């Protein structure tokens, strides 16, 4: 059972079953109406709806059907208090066609009316101010129900008198998704976000204060249907029925929200260029350079005479530091001139008992050779050493000078 069906068919105990008496009165304030006995009753006309459809107010697109409520003056006993609020605000919103009128409504002029069920407001009728009330009709809303999500949300919305006559519409009207967003038209909308939040709601695209799906499109409207606009301002005073049915109303689609409170960090700066863009300049900078080649450019055509002169000067400098050139070792005649004797441990007077060339102890009857520095060695070991060197293996003294000085 639908909530609006409960609102019109569930009679209170004090009222008869046949009719429901509604008492209203005009209060001192221009924006409120308080209940008083005015002989108003509410009944539902099911004959106006097509066969096979039940009257509904706002529902998904697959179950859309017209819903009409007539207000008739009728005297009845057992009144039930009913209060509603009238608020006049600038009209902006999405179009609501109301081209049919049913006679029999009250002669009082009502700017607008709305109903709140369980904290949510729903519009019931939209009437032009210059005319007397003849009918209150709710036509079938074109498009799926998520085209009008603010009507089933917790925000406050009401119907208001239409703006001046709009310009004639073309033969084929654009779908509802192409209307200008409510947020751009109305600067005082309560749904504006002052912080830097961004809601990503699935495949739906935000359009002003409500979202619409790109996959669902509403039927084209006839050019003869007048357009009345629903405003987007909060309702200051409410019309409430004591029928709790919040669990029966369609809820908002649960979507996952992502919040970005801080801006993304800037991209890192590009790395500075390397000092050596290639290997060749780096390699050339590491090469040694002579004083003659230092200049703005590197010349590879060097004079051969200059190179030879430079090398010769370097050799002369080395010869001055080394002294006169001498033969590498002693000749065989020079080696034989060195004194030698047979080793006898009883008559041996030197403290040296081994050969430093072969690291062997002196034995009896071995031939020893004595160098001018008085160092003794095996004759075979030291002769071989003197053929390649001119110095003593122990003290590095010249072995060829001492004998000549002795002579």
UniProtKB/Swiss-Prot annotation:
Pfam families: zf-RING_2 (PF13639). This is RING finger protein 44. Residues 26-58 are annotated as: Disordered. The gene is Rnf44. InterPro entries: Znf_RING, Znf_RING/FYVE/PHD. SMART domains: RING. A zinc finger (RING-type) spans 355-396. GO terms for molecular function: zinc ion binding.
